[in-house]
């Protein structure tokens, strides 16, 4: 299903980029050309690096927070992913129409590897929260939702730090005049560190029985038992 979805997105992007009528619906030709030739790359350098880093960190953290907070609905995380995919697809169509796809890829890869992975993890966490009350198992829906919500707080804290790192890369690396292999290498290293922490270190903790939830004393006794 994911591969079919990607194929549809690529077909839509290719259709827009190759169809002048569809491309015209995105804006006047001169503005689209300016976006492809100047605005897309200028976005990364038009503000001081520290200010820009703070802006993108806040924006990405807010997107991730929405996925977590409203994940209980089951719809909002999907909506966030679709909206972001559409925005990226439109940018890709404009850049493709002006033969600038390579520029777009180079400017997105350094920070985008970790950033996009973090957003997908946030969406997955939100959907897991939704599933916790749809299929609570042996627990009541309230107990299941409370336990998974407390565990998800650990994920949210980790994502704040991950998005801080991707913000640092976007603010201080992506727009720098460094060789692209170095920039992309920094992004790959950041993603590798994130995946190692999540899958290797986190996997070991999970196999030991760690869930990220509070112990019963800290969380409060869920029910009184008669004896």
Locations of regions flagged by a protein language model:
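Generic detector of multi-pass transmembrane helix bundles and their immediately adjacent loops
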Residues: 63, 69-227
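Charged, low-complexity, helix-prone segments enriched in Lys/Glu/Asp/Gln
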Residues: 8, 30-36, 87, 93, ...
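Single conserved hydrophobic/aromatic residue that forms the stacking wall/gate
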Residues: 1-12
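Interfacial/capping segments of alpha-helical transmembrane domains
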Residues: 13-38, 83
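Generic secretory/membrane-interface signal
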Residues: 1-3, 53-54, 78, 109
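Short aromatic-rich membrane-water interface segments that cap or initiate transmembrane helices
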Residues: 32-55, 105-114
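Individual transmembrane alpha-helix segments
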Residues: 45-76
